[in-house]
């Protein structure tokens, strides 16, 4: 009997597109998917182009047959896996993040030259972007980085079938969850401080006084998401474990958990909510945490408030304080009537409540102010403890809104205008995460600890980087003062010297926070690691309560719950999960950062330059270096200009070697400046020959060239403001920075 022959499917699995696979892609994908209509906007009727389409189809079919005979390859469709990998490879090249082999580019260019109306050659990323649009891999205006993302952004539809078991009608009733017997009911108010657009509320802050000692205690109430998405359940495996994080992109939010689960677990004002509670006290002298603990509870009184509303409250307090100080200083020389009039004016100007929620009382204001003062103390403590190692990571981040048709609707500030309110929330969350880490370490629990890896060779090089010979730093307008843009550049340099934070199953040092006691526990609706922390600590709470009850079994509404609850995640399993989460979250973070840049540049090209081609951006100078004595800089830029998307000389073939051209040329620029574009909250590098562009200066820049998909932006300085530094012109550049804030 003749043995059965099994044909093995060979798939493209590498990152190098050689000639053979390039030809397979051309025959099995490019010629079958090519459609020049994808490059044009909808305008002409389909009937008018039907004849041309039929003619093009015949040409493509004839070309496919001819190439199949010449190359001795079958003209059959590529398998989905190979096609997807090759398309992602081409997309990475189109976005400027990857490289392509010369042989593959030559094969593609040779075939395209035979197709009527197609890009004649694929020589650079912009040509590749047009090719991907022509074969329908992406639509005009699409974020190509998102389209080519290799990770998962959405859970499979089959996950929705597993939700019903966790969304029963009785789940809102006390006793339907095994841990309800351990929950403590809280009737004190808790404040959820978020953006106005936030739909998933997973944390709130409360301040209570111990009835016995009278000491102040802070409580961070976190949504108990593991009630509705338990560890190792089919729902958890297909959603949270698969995605590991919610990905926030300007064009949309890709949730880690299904919307019904988020709606059930989120903290709400209209019903009691199950919470994971983190309690701690802050030493008023040292600022360190003390008397901390974790538990579970019911929250009955949630108060939602936005960052803008809290910031207005803090600004009002600062304004009243300044007026009070000014009034006291002048009242010594004023009559009694004048003093009384001044007091009335101070109260009138400081007592506005137009932007406050209707529920806010004097006691609520006092609690919110107390949260801010405690956060300031914690921030100062961390800064003092870290010393020179302290990293200021509060960089600006614009809020970009994208509408239908890939249209950028707005670019607004979401950090600088509400900095104090965000500091209050951030420090409370950092403290809560530190408490969870300490409790886990003290009880030998394996959780996803958060920290930074040891420095790689690239980070060591960045940390010890020195400018090339001949580069000189230009002195600031005021060497004794740290300007806004200057402080930002220092933070960027500090961050370049540390690695991205990762998760590890044992305690790990966090360079950014200068501590070994850190994890993530306050955002379980958007981070899988937080759910794992909750699971481990809740199992420990169950076991602790079981032991304290004399060995008796705690009763529950679910018969099988004691067996499930008493199973913590094994250390080797936690190690595997931490590695997986770190990898996926890093991919998501890179996608979010690159997408922010893409949509910002798209906003420049789509909205600003179409209305005003010579629009001038107000920019702050954060650093300037003189390179007129550093020939390496000039030589490097000449080579870069050769590879740039546009050639000033029309791409004429040069016969003089690059080294020879460099020796024959003068310097094209004398200075390199790091600037900050206030209108876009965007840091950039500008090359120029203007000696007045120094740290602290305010300049105006015009756009020379912009390519959003490639992340390419070229600016030219056209004016330097005279008569002062950025402090004098602060109202003008802040007006560009915060155009959406009436305050």
From Swiss-Prot:
UniProtKB keywords: Exonuclease, Hydrolase, Mitochondrion, Nuclease, Transit peptide
GO BP, one annotated term: mitochondrial RNA processing
Coiled coil location: none
Q: What is its main location?
A: mitochondrion
Positions of region (Disordered) = 320-357
Subcellular localization: Mitochondrion
Q: Which segments show compositional bias classed as Basic and acidic residues?
A: 325-344
Tell me which residues form the transit peptide.
Answer: 1-67
Gene disruption phenotype: RNAi-mediated knockdown at the procyclic stage causes moderate growth defect and reduces the levels of several mitochondrial RNAs, including never edited, unedited, and edited mRNAs as well as guided RNAs (gRNA). Also results in the accumulation of fragments of the flanking region upstream of the mature 5'end of 12S rRNA, the 5' flanking sequence and the truncated 12S rRNA sequence, and the 5' full-length 12S rRNAs.
Residue stretches making up the RNB domain: 186-542
Kindly list the GO molecular function terms attached to this UniProt entry: 3'-5'-RNA exonuclease activity; exoribonuclease II activity; RNA binding; RNA exonuclease activity
Q: Which reaction does it catalyse?
A: Exonucleolytic cleavage in the 3'- to 5'-direction to yield nucleoside 5'-phosphates
InterPro entries from the entry? NA-bd_OB-fold, RNase_II/R, RNR_Ribonuclease
Q: Which domain of life is it from?
A: Eukaryota
Instruction: Write down the EC number.
Output: 3.1.13.1
Gene Ontology CC: one annotated term: mitochondrial degradosome
What is this protein's function per UniProt?
3'-5'exoribonuclease which is involved in the post-transcriptional processing, editing and degradation of mitochondrial RNAs, including mRNAs, rRNAs and guided RNAs (gRNA). As part of the mitochondrial 3' processome (MPsome), involved in the maturation of guided RNA (gRNA) precursors by catalyzing the processive 3'-5' degradation of uridylated gRNA precursors. Plays a role in the degradation of 12S rRNA processing intermediates and maturation by-products.
Self-association state and partner proteins as the record states: Component of the mitochondrial 3' processome (MPsome) complex composed at least of terminal uridylyltransferase KRET1/TUT1, 3'-5' exonuclease DSS1, MPSS1, MPSS2 and MPSS3. Within the complex, interacts with KRET1 and MPSS2. Component of the mitochondrial degradosome complex composed at least of 3'-5' exonuclease DSS1 and helicase SUV3. Within the complex, interacts with helicase SUV3.
UniProt record similarity statement: Belongs to the RNR ribonuclease family.
* UniProt name for this protein: Mitochondrial exoribonuclease DSS-1
Q: Which organism is it from?
A: Trypanosoma brucei brucei
């Amino acid at each position: 009997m003749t043995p059965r022959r099994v044909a093995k499917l060979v798939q493209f699995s590498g990152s190098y597109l050689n000639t053979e696979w390039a030809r397979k892609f051309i025959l099995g994908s490019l010629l079958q998917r090519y459609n020049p209509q994808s490059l044009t906007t909808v305008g002409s009727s389909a009937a008018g182009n039907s004849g041309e389409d039929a003619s093009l189809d015949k040409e493509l079919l004839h070309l496919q047959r001819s190439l199949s005979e010449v190359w001795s390859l079958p003209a059959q469709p590529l398998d989905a896996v190979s096609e997807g990998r090759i398309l992602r490879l081409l997309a990475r090249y189109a976005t400027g993040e990857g490289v392509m082999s010369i042989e593959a580019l030559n094969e593609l260019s040779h075939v395209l030259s035979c197709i009527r109306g197609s890009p004649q050659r694929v020589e650079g990323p912009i040509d590749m972007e047009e090719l991907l649009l022509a074969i329908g891999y992406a639509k005009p205006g699409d974020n190509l980085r998102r389209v080519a993302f290799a990770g998962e952004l959405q859970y499979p539809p089959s996950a929705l079938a597993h939700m019903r078991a966790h969304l029963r009608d009785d789940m809102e009733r006390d006793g339907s969850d095994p841990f309800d017997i351990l929950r403590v009911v809280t009737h004190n108010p808790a404040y959820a401080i978020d953006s106005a657009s936030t739909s998933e509320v997973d944390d709130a802050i409360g301040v209570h006084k111990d009835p016995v000692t009278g000491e102040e205690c802070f409580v961070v109430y976190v949504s108990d998401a593991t009630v509705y998405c338990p560890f190792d359940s089919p729902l958890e495996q297909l959603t949270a474990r698969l995605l590991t994080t919610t990905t926030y992109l300007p064009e949309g939010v890709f949730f880690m958990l299904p919307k019904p689960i988020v709606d059930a677990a989120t903290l709400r004002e209209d019903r009691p909510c199950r919470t994971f509670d983190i309690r701690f006290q802050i030493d008023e002298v040292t600022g360190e945490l003390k008397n901390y603990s974790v538990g579970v509870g019911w929250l009955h009184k949630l108060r939602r408030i936005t960052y803008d509303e809290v910031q207005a409250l803090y600004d009002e307090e600062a304004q009243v304080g300044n007026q009070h100080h000014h009034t006291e200083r002048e009242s010594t020389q004023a009559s009694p009537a004048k003093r009384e009039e001044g007091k009335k004016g101070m109260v009138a100007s400081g007592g506005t409540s137009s932007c406050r929620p209707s529920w806010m009382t004097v006691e609520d204001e006092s609690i919110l102010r107390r949260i801010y003062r405690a956060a300031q103390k914690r921030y100062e403590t961390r800064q003092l403890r870290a010393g020179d190692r302290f990293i200021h990571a509060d960089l600006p981040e614009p809020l970009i809104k994208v509408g239908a048709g890939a249209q950028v609707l707005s670019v607004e500030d979401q950090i600088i205008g509400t900095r104090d309110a965000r500091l209050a929330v951030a420090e409370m969350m950092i403290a809560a995460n530190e408490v969870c880490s300490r409790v886990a370490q003290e009880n030998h629990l394996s959780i996803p600890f958060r920290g930074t890896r040891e420095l790689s060779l690239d980070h060591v090089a960045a940390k010890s980087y020195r400018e090339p010979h001949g580069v000189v730093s230009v002195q600031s307008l005021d060497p004794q003062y740290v300007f806004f843009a200057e402080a930002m550049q220092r933070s960027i340099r500090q961050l370049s010297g540390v690695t991205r934070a990762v998760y590890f199953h044992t305690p790990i040092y966090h360079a950014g926070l200068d501590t070994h006691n850190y994890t993530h526990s306050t955002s379980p609706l958007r981070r899988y690691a937080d759910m794992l922390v909750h699971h481990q600590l809740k199992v420990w709470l169950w076991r602790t309560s079981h032991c304290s009850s004399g060995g008796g079994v705690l009763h529950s509404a679910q018969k099988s719950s004691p067996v499930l609850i008493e199973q913590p995640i094994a250390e080797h399993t936690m190690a595997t999960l931490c590695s997986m989460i770190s990898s996926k979250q890093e991919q998501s973070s890179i996608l979010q950062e690159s997408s922010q840049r893409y949509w910002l540049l798209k906003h420049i090209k789509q909205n600003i330059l179409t209305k005003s081609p010579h629009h001038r951006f107000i920019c702050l100078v954060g650093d300037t270096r003189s390179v007129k004595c550093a020939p390496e800089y000039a030589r490097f830029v000449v080579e870069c200009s050769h590879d740039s998307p546009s050639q000033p000389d029309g791409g004429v073939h040069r016969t003089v070697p690059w080294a020879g051209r460099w020796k024959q040329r003068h310097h094209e620029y004398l200075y390199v400046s790091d600037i900050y574009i206030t209108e876009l909250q965007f840091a950039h590098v500008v090359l120029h020959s203007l000696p007045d562009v120094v740290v602290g200066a305010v300049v105006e820049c015009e756009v020379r060239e912009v390519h959003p998909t490639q992340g390419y932006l070229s600016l030219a300085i056209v004016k330097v403001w005279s008569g002062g530094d950025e402090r004098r012109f602060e109202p003008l550049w802040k007006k560009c920075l915060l155009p959406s804030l009436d305050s």
